Amino acid sequence: MEQDAMKYRLVTRSDFDGLVCGMLLKEKDLIDEVTFVHPKDMQDGLIAIDGHDITTNLPYVEGVHLAFDHHYSETLRVEQQDNHIIDPEARSAARVVYNYYGGPEAFPNIAPDLLEAVDKGDAAEFTVDEVLDPQGWELLNFIMDARTGLGRFRNFRISNYQLMMELIDFCRNHSIEEILETPDVKERVELYRAHQEDFKRQMYNCSRQIGRVLLVDLREEDTIYAGNRFVKYALFPEACISIQVMWGFKKQNTV
């Protein structure tokens, strides 16, 4: 497949899948800018999209140059478009990008274990051990997820956006062991580890299972610790859905 001569902006989610999509498109020298957005903002038309944009793992918006996705729901919502590269059988948007541009032959510098890790992460196919004591790529996945909540506890040297931008380049030619030892990743790992056991106890003590539903009530907690969003399911393996209740801003409402 011929490589486009011009450069595009990548519009994607601020998560591990978005990070790897950025790596792949940067490896093909297709992008010179990255914008991280929320999917609902795309659906609500709040993000201006045109022919200079490539989107990944987001709802399709008309006018985009290329849109990569793997959600089956998008095949129902949107009529088939030539620039909508969607594969519901793929476990991640990064895998769709990877396959579209030629797979391993097109990306000799991208380690296969990285693609397996992003597939596992986006499809939530973690083992209990990987959830409760993550290592390697799984650990990077969780610390880069805003839902883990690390940003509530420390003003890091650089923002998550800056770290994502640095990792798009750094991850292309460094091992996961080297990535986890970089200062800006390491300080997030240290905070994650410092909260790990407290978060498990909190999830266990504040949760009540009703059938297959897990109710997590955090309104009596002075501190809500940081931790990955799958821990509660590892602690309560019979639950298949959870409802989390906590105070809103200045306890004016519950959310």
Residue ranges and their predicted role:
Residues 121-213:
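Hydrophobic, aromatic-enriched interface-forming segments
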